[in-house]
UniProtKB/Swiss-Prot annotation:
<feature type="active site">
    <location>
        <position position="112"/>
    </location>
</feature>
<dbReference type="InterPro" id="IPR004655">
    <property type="entry name" value="FabH"/>
</dbReference>
<dbReference type="GO" id="GO:0005737">
    <property type="term" value="C:cytoplasm"/>
</dbReference>
<feature type="active site">
    <location>
        <position position="279"/>
    </location>
</feature>
<feature type="active site">
    <location>
        <position position="249"/>
    </location>
</feature>
<keyword id="KW-0808">Transferase</keyword>
<keyword id="KW-0444">Lipid biosynthesis</keyword>
<feature type="region of interest" description="ACP-binding">
    <location>
        <begin position="250"/>
        <end position="254"/>
    </location>
</feature>
<keyword id="KW-0443">Lipid metabolism</keyword>
<dbReference type="InterPro" id="IPR013751">
    <property type="entry name" value="ACP_syn_III_N"/>
</dbReference>
<dbReference type="GO" id="GO:0033818">
    <property type="term" value="F:beta-ketoacyl-acyl-carrier-protein synthase III activity"/>
</dbReference>
<keyword id="KW-0511">Multifunctional enzyme</keyword>
<dbReference type="InterPro" id="IPR013747">
    <property type="entry name" value="ACP_syn_III_C"/>
</dbReference>
<keyword id="KW-0012">Acyltransferase</keyword>
<comment type="pathway">
    <text>Lipid metabolism; fatty acid biosynthesis.</text>
</comment>
<protein>
    <recommendedName>
        <fullName>Beta-ketoacyl-[acyl-carrier-protein] synthase III</fullName>
        <ecNumber>2.3.1.180</ecNumber>
    </recommendedName>
</protein>
<dbReference type="GO" id="GO:0006633">
    <property type="term" value="P:fatty acid biosynthetic process"/>
</dbReference>
Length: 324
């Protein structure tokens, strides 16, 4: 049986930084209001770079670290809710940019759970024995999704990309997983309603900005997601004490505080970087993983047992436990 492992990690964010003080100049808010409620102090916002541009930079970093070219890749899976276009896919643009001419490429849409869903999918491709190497990237330009006059959402999000190189391995690294969706609660977090625009339809143009019922999403995270994480750990071959780090979607620092207590782990095992980047949706977990490797917290030598968990629109939530 074939197994998969994460062999390289990388991230990339736009150069421009927008602080809470900057936002206070264009909307009715201030640093204390934002940071005390979310933990966010700044975010990176693209001036000219598209979602595929950010993802391409990550792909180039991953290949450079591994010493490979695009021609050696079998697939590219790109998780995003802010694609350059619906067609062609953002992944196809990345494939062309890096010369990965034999790789199949597609986008995956699962909001802030997107990277976890994409990584789970990629692991199955390699486990089939038919594929050896692939890129899994989360990339977002959420600055184009928010209504910049709405302080309830605009202050939360940022742009960025992160990803991993997944390769075949002789040892098992993916230990447990749980992927979930609940479409009955889909309206509490929405973006990109396109509506019907034909001359034969009776539908008016829809509001396409990102909309969120913050309280409902907060409660969902600390109730449903925390319960799912605990269940995934219970059904895995490890104990909660075996986990070195839990890398959770970076939505809100208060969510992480409550999740740590619910799961029963030390808060220090839940690294956070939303203060620097805000909520980057599908990019948040791989950016955090890349930073943990850069900081020496995760040596990327197979010695650490790490839990990844994303949660967001759909509603969707997913957890992976793996050795890295």
């Amino acid at each position: 049986m074939a197994f998969a492992k994460i062999s390289q990690v990388a991230h990339y964010v736009p150069e421009q930084v927008v602080t809470n003080h900057d936002l206070a100049q264009i909307m009715d808010t201030n640093d204390e209001w934002i940071s005390s409620r979310t933990g966010i102090r700044q975010r990176h916002i693209s001036r000219t770079e598209s979602t595929s541009d950010l993802a391409t930079e990550v792909a180039k970093k991953l290949m450079a670290k591994a010493g490979i070219t695009g021609k050696e890749l079998d697939f590219i899976i790109l998780a995003t809710i802010t694609p350059d276009s619906m067609m062609p896919s953002t992944a196809a643009r990345v494939q062309a940019n890096i010369g990965a001419n034999k790789a199949f490429a597609f986008d995956l849409t699962a909001a802030c759970s997107g990277f976890v869903f994409a990584l789970s999918t990629a692991e199955k491709f390699i486990a089939s024995g038919r594929f050896q190497k692939g890129l899994v990237i989360g990339s977002e330009t959420l600055s184009k999704a928010v209504d910049w006059s709405d302080r309830s959402t605009a202050v939360l999000f940022g742009d960025g990309a992160g990803g991993v190189l997944l390769e075949a391995s002789e040892q098992e690294h993916f230990l447990a997983e749980s992927l979930n969706s609940d479409g009955s609660r889909s309206e509490c977090l929405t973006y990109g309603h396109s509506g019907l625009h034909s001359p034969f339809s009776d539908q008016e143009s829809a509001d396409s900005f990102l909309k969120m019922d913050g309280r409902t999403v907060f409660d969902f995270a600390i109730r449903d997601v925390a319960k799912s994480i605990k269940q995934t750990i219970d059904e895995s071959p490890i104990e909660v004490t075996d986990l070195d780090y839990l890398l959770l979607h970076q939505a809100n620092d208060r969510i992480l505080d409550k999740m740590a207590r619910k799961i029963g782990v030390d808060r220090a095992k839940l690294p956070a970087n939303m203060m620097e980047y805000g909520n980057t949706s599908a990019a948040s977990i791989p950016i955090l993983l890349s930073e943990c490797v850069e900081q020496g917290l995760i040596p990327l030598d197979g010695s650490q047992t790490v839990l990844l968990s994303g949660f967001g629109g759909g509603l969707t939530w997913g957890t992976l436990i793996l050795t890295i």
